Amino acid sequence: MLAIMVRFYQSQSEKSAHNTKKIYSDNHQLLISFINSKALQTMAKTIRPSYYDDDDISSEDDFTYSSKTNKKSRGDEEDDELSSISFGALNRAQAKLSKRDSDDDEEEEEEEESADDGFFEDSDSDGPPEESSSSNRHGNNDKKKKNKHAPSESSSKRPVSRIRDIPGLPSRREQTLHTDIRFDAAYGKADLRKIRKDYAFLDDYRKQEISNMEGILRDKKNRLNDDEREEIKLQLQSLKSRMDTLKNRDLEESILKNYKKQQMDDFKSGKVNKPYFLKRSDKRKVLQKAKFDSMKPKQREKAMERKRKKRLGKEFKQLEFRPNNR
């Protein structure tokens, strides 16, 4: 009875050892095939197709010979490697192989679907095939990217103003930035008499500025170049002409005011039945007579010379364009 039990246990142990060896051999074969496939993929990436030469044929023979020798040596070493590989490593290798096979199948299906779609889309149109989404994304980014030396762009939706700002010239905003609302036309016509009365003190500053400029021009110690001297002369002439204009305007106002006052006094005293208000032509004559009376002899001669030249110019124009009746 004891001998029968010993034989039974020996047979069971032999069966279990045979099963474990079979599992080891199957898993080892899977691992070997996985390693060989990876090696072939890397070699396929590095080896490129070309024309067949003698050197290529010899290299292919060497490659096949080396692969055969490797297979033989691996077959001899399989039994030794089975004992060193664990179940965990074999399970991980098997999971990776199954995952890789499923990924390859999905990629092949996607490639077939994209090829079918491209075929049907290209058959309808004569143009080039459409680019992928990634290429479209890159193309959009290239379009959005601008060169810093590119000309400036403006929106076509906004209407163009009639008066445009020219680079290098003062813009309209700068000109109208600091405007005095007291002289704005939107508030009505300005009262020159009141303005002149309120800002009469500015004449003192203008006179002081004229005297300073004349002193700068007379002083020989000031090392002024020709451009600076010419600019000061122009400013001095502008100030003098402005002062003369203001004086003439004040004189006209005083003459008309005095004439009006005299007429009202005569009317109140009974010398005249009705006051006489001057017409525009009469005003001009009265102002001209008063100006000549207030002028110095040299100024009067210059004014007479200007009037004579002006009158001669008008006469020459009339003679030049007179029609010939002969």
UniProtKB/Swiss-Prot annotation:
It holds the Pfam family RRP36. One of its GO terms (biological process) is maturation of SSU-rRNA from tricistronic rRNA transcript (SSU-rRNA, 5.8S rRNA, LSU-rRNA). Residues 51-178, 288-326 are annotated as: Disordered. Its main location: nucleus. It comes from the Eukaryota. The keyword Nucleus applies. InterPro entries: RRP36. Residues 52-63, 103-129 have a biased composition (Acidic residues). Residues 207-250 form a coiled coil. GO terms for cellular component: 90S preribosome; nucleolus; small-subunit processome. Residues 290-304 have a biased composition (Basic and acidic residues). Belongs to the RRP36 family. Associates with 90S and pre-40S pre-ribosomal particles. PANTHER family: RIBOSOMAL RNA PROCESSING PROTEIN 36 HOMOLOG. Component of the 90S pre-ribosome involved in the maturation of rRNAs. Required for early cleavages of the pre-RNAs in the 40S ribosomal subunit maturation pathway. This is rRNA biogenesis protein RRP36. It comes from Candida tropicalis (strain ATCC MYA-3404 / T1) (Yeast). The lineage of its organism: Eukaryota, Fungi, Dikarya, Ascomycota, Saccharomycotina.
